Swiss-Prot record:
GO process annotations (BP): rRNA processing
Classification via InterPro entries: WD40/YVTN_repeat-like_dom_sf, WD40_repeat_CS, WD40_repeat_dom_sf, WD40_rpt, WDR55, WDR55_POC1
UniProt GO cellular component terms: cytoplasm; nucleolus; nucleoplasm
Domain of life: Eukaryota
First-listed, main subcellular location of the protein, grouped into a coarse class: nucleus
Positions bearing Phosphoserine: 14, 354, 382
Keywords tagged on the record: Cytoplasm, Nucleus, Phosphoprotein, Repeat, rRNA processing, WD repeat
Compositionally biased intervals (Basic and acidic residues): 1-11
Residues bearing the modification Phosphothreonine: 378
Designated name of the protein: WD repeat-containing protein 55
Length: 383
């Protein structure tokens, strides 16, 4: 594991000084510095073991950066311009040696992580622009396109293992169950799709929701499936109850464009209004704001291999890092308070939009409000 995800080392208590070394000490930040791109990034992924971040932008360029909390140490390692149109998604292989990218040009590329060299190109992998990518294991990956097509690929073979088109609109996002048997798809037609990739067959589509389904993830140890939507609502499905929603939760957001789980109960959402919200699932609550891309839509979110950093890309052409360490602990151990309806979102860090102490705000609430909330909570914990 790289040092950025480790605890900061204690300072050496020695009084000895090197007379030849008079340089100012390196500044250590809470998070790595922002990365500025020439175009918005629509694909974002962290390396599974090293402090590397990959991004693919709307011009078709792919970048890999090394990131660090030491000021001035976040750097571009290489870039690739092999895609002819926008790069829609990127993903590292399980061993971290390869980077897979998909594009509006309908191609799948496999790049070497160390040098950025193109090792394999699958041209015209789909008949329509590819919009989403998910790695199943070291050899198998799934792709979804703008017309609802789903393909399953084995990198050791030519051609797709599975090619299905059950959705009527674009595939926005995909997720996998822990057994790697069922592929879940969120589509612009408002339906959650279920595909059995072990038997290579279609299972079912859920009832259509009123807006596009833009994201999908498993929560609550696989017992719940959460889907974000273009109307700003999170739809919840019970596992093995995919036909209809079990619950829904409307955020005060124009839309939910991307979503990433932080714990089994907490996820972060990115919206058109530029705000990154931390949301607790069952009980359903907006915990507060992790950060924002001021006035610009959030395009993609990714969580680092150690879980400490959330990275976000926005239409402001910046990649930003947000510290998740304290938030993860509070949600799991301490967070029991209900946010007042109609009030502003609570800032979860000094980087959000204020320097207020979010945790002090929680501590100041009285015990009576906690008791009242616990009494009311039975109405929130729907199955």
């Amino acid at each position: 594991m790289d040092r950025t995800c480790e605890e900061r080392p204690a300072e050496d208590g020695s009084d000895e000084e090197d007379p030849d070394s008079m340089e100012a000490p390196t500044r250590i930040r809470d998070t790595p510095e922002d990365i500025v791109l020439e175009a918005p990034a629509s694909g974002l992924a962290f390396h599974p073991a090293r402090d590397l971040l990959a991004a693919g932008d709307v011009d078709g360029d792919v970048f890999v950066f090394s990131y660090s909390c030491q000021e001035g140490e976040t750097k571009e390692l290489w870039s690739s311009g092999h895609h002819l149109k926008a790069c829609r998604a990127v993903a590292f292989s399980e061993d971290g040696q390869k980077l897979i990218t998909v594009s509006k040009d309908k191609a799948i590329h496999v790049l070497d992580v160390e040098q950025g060299q193109l090792e394999r190109r699958v041209s015209k992998a789909h008949g329509a622009p590819i919009n989403s990518l998910l790695l199943v294991d070291e050899n198998v990956l799934a792709t979804g396109d703008d017309t609802g097509g789903i393909c399953l690929w084995d990198q050791r073979k030519e051609g797709p293992l599975m090619d299905m088109r059950q959705h009527e609109e674009y595939i926005a996002d995909m997720a996998l169950d822990p057994a790697k048997k069922l592929l879940l798809t969120a589509s612009g037609d408002g339906c959650l799709g279920i595909f059995n990739i072990k038997r290579r067959r279609f299972e079912l589509l859920s009832e259509p929701q009123s807006g596009d389904l833009t994201s999908v993830t498993l929560m609550k140890w696989g017992k719940k499936v959460a889907c974000g939507s273009s109307e700003g609502t999170i739809y919840l499905f019970n596992w093995n109850g995919f036909g209809a929603t079990s619950d829904r939760f409307a955020l005060r957001a124009e839309s939910i464009d991307c979503m990433v789980p932080v714990t089994e109960s907490l996820l972060c959402t990115g919206s058109t209004d530029g705000v990154i919200r931390a949301v607790n699932i069952l009980p359903n609550r907006v915990v507060g704001s992790v950060g924002q891309h001021t006035g610009e839509p959030v395009e993609e979110l990714a969580l680092s291999h150690c879980g400490r950093f959330l990275a976000s890309s926005g239409h402001d052409q910046r990649l930003k890092f947000w510290d998740m360490a304290q938030l993860r602990a509070v949600v799991v151990d301490d967070y029991r308070r209900r946010k007042k309806k109609g009030g502003p979102l609570r800032a979860l860090s000094s980087k959000t939009w204020s320097t207020d102490d979010f945790f002090a705000g929680l501590r100041e609430e009285g015990e009576d409000s906690m008791a009242q909330e616990e009494k009311e909570e039975t109405g929130d914990d729907s199955d």
